[in-house]
Amino acid sequence: MKMFFRLTRELRDELKRPLGELVRGPIPEPYLKVRGELEKHPVVTVGDVVTENVLKIGVKPIIALYDLKTKRKEYSPEIEDTAVFLTVTNPPGTITKALLDTVRKAFGLAERGRNVHILVSGEEDLAAIPAVLYAPLGTLVLYGQPDEGVVLIKVTPECKRRCAKILASMEVVRDGD
């Protein structure tokens, strides 16, 4: 049975607030501002533009999630080809069980020294939530805030609790509902 979590109207408003520190500026400014921090910790990127720009400043994310779209338009980022590639389906406005399982699997591979790229068929916009939930403490998770900059999340117990609360507040849908 397929199961997924769907974003509610109330949560949409909450998620407009960044889950971490918003680093403002036009590209590549935000990435250059956080580069020193990124070089000291494991990094997870969410989004095509974020992944491409982190790679451009010489930082290799342990896990990169993207959907080959930006602002709902097709996008072909320049990405590395030495990583393990996984694919998963995740419709817009949802977090599927398949996405949760794939992110968990990716962290298992990353623990063994592999860099992992996850190509999301659908949308990866909410993927920072499972990334934070499964990431080891101290990991940095980055996602884009369109037309504003990049959000830098330092994974802490408090941050994990906030993401778990968001996931628990989402509407649970089972195949056929």
UniProtKB/Swiss-Prot annotation:
Keywords: Coenzyme A biosynthesis, GTP-binding, Kinase, Nucleotide-binding, Transferase
Effect on the protein upon substituting residue 48 to A: Loss of activity. Mutant shows a dramatic reduction in growth rate
Family: Belongs to the GTP-dependent DPCK family.
Effect of deleting the gene: Disruption of the gene results in CoA auxotrophy.
Source domain of life: Archaea
Originating species: Thermococcus kodakarensis (strain ATCC BAA-918 / JCM 12380 / KOD1) (Pyrococcus kodakaraensis (strain KOD1))
One Pfam family of this chain: DUF359
HAMAP family with a match to the protein in the record: Dephospho_CoA_kinase_GTP_dep
One of the GO biological process terms: coenzyme A biosynthetic process
EC number: 2.7.1.237
Protein name: GTP-dependent dephospho-CoA kinase
The keyword Nucleotide-binding is annotated on this UniProt entry: yes
Known catalytic reactions: 3'-dephospho-CoA + GTP = GDP + CoA + H(+)
GO MF annotation terms: GTP binding; kinase activity
